[in-house]
Amino acid sequence: LLEEYREIFTDIPSETHLTEHKVVLTQKEPVRCKAYPIPYHLESVMSKELDDMLAMGIIERSDAAYASPIVLVKKSDNTYRMCINFKELNKITVFDPEPMMSPDDIFPKLSGSKFYSTFDFCKGYWAIPMEESSKDCTSFITPRGLMRFRVMPFGMVNAGSTYNRMVRKLLEGSQ
């Protein structure tokens, strides 16, 4: 089965049409932060990540007035994850109060079910496109110039709410 349906088991996220991520700001003045220094021995890690993200269509070049810094975070397997510090942008973002389901909400609904499934959404945030008017505020500083996200990045204050809403739409009627 895995071989027959290989195309659905991929490391490359595909975009959903269920929703887009919109960023609503409390001010018009763009957020501009200074770049954080990247240690020389990690520049190749960042460069490869940028190449991969450009090739997958996750990011694109930007000429926006916004600029957030990159942070390389060491993972438990000693590799690095490239993250964007959206802290200043998050401060001026209108909060989305989308309710998150808790285990106490979910487990009673599972009682008495005949079949159970799990989902592992490959890079799930990257499956959600950014609304066109919100792309510029995701811009971040690289040695190659500014880049911005075409899809929803991690680290934005309302990303979890948008993702939760998308999963809810995806699973509607499956109970």
Language model features by range: what are they?
Residues 1-175:
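Retroelement reverse transcriptase polymerase core
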